[in-house]
Amino acid sequence: MSFRDFTFPQVCTDLGLNFDEKSLFRDVAPISIDAHTQEFLELGRTMSSGINNEKARSEFVIAPFLLKLYILSGKRFGLFSGTELNVDASRGLNGVCDFLLAREPLVYMLRAPLIAVVEAKNDNVNNGFGQCVASMKAIELFNHKHGKPTETIYGASTTGVAWKFFKLQDTNLTLDSDDYDFSNLDKIAGILMHIVTTK
């Protein structure tokens, strides 16, 4: 069993989480994404839609968007792609995370505290919920194990076009009730910047 085997909402029962749904980022200010980057991402969206698989969406849309955010932040966080996170195999809290965001801007080493996970899905953003939540719980345990416990862990499930966000605080899981899509890139950028810069 691994992250990918978890389903939602069963993951809440499996991991002993209390679930709630409410707006999380309504007051977060958007960050302007320049026209060149938007054009580049639109091209990536078109290409990935034609190829129609998770790898294409991850490489052509999500990774470039996160890399742009990394630059806009002044390289203030660590960004890892396709990294294994093996915390507790007996509970299925192991596997490969599409993208991990870390507090420290390291490139060659995954170090606590991790702050967020972004999971890529091909067609339906909801299909990534179970995997995303399990990865968030693994991050919480990883940070605790390495002496860097964090109060809040964030997660996102995305097709590169649609985005849904989660927040985990101990055993309390909250799904953001607001939906975001490709037309809200500035808002999505603002949310992600809020996540990586808030301590």
Positions of predicted regions on the chain:
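Conserved catalytic cores of phosphodiester-cleaving nucleases, focusing on short active-site segments
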Residues: 61, 97-105, 113-122, 135
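Extended hydrophobic secondary-structure segments that form protein cores and membrane-embedded regions
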Residues: 81, 114-119, 153-159
